[in-house]
Amino acid sequence: MNATHVLAILTIHTDNLPENFQEIIKHEREVIAAWKAERFLEQLFLRPTRNGAILIFKNLTEEEVNEKMKTLPLYPLMKSLEVLPLIADTAI
């Protein structure tokens, strides 16, 4: 059986960042490391503009990914969140 993948695109507000932003980032990295250790987060990519990230989850539903994203320390700074299921092209 093929693993299911879900893509999450997170964009945060970068104007008026809180004073403890570096602390929030540190906690965010800890959460991401735990997700990778639990093996349901396959990869995280930072956006070139540094205003968000792209996360690739595996073996979770869209709903589960949405719930996980709400637990991120950066979530309160969220400007937008897109969660998209991915379908592998098995012909290639």
Regions found by a protein language model. Name each.
Residues M1-I92:
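Conserved, structured core segments of small domains
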